[in-house]
Amino acid sequence: MKELIEYIAKSIASDPNSVVVTEVVEDERTVFRLEVAEEDKGKVIGRQGRVAEAMRVLLRVAAVKAGTRAVLEFV
């Protein structure tokens, strides 16, 4: 799942080297924290959060297939 988020974010970002995904396991869920360069935040989040929401949906689907829960946070 971490690789999926990294792949999508690096494809969108102007500076793919600045993309960092951190995975934190809490209780019964996994929290993925996505960090990108300041100038790429708008691109990665998208208009009215559409890209961010699409990434969250894909992450949720992958988590359900794996039998877990996952959350995506933008830092």
Could you describe each region identified by the protein language model?
Residues 1-43, 47, 52-75:
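RNA-contacting regions in translation and RNA-metabolism proteins
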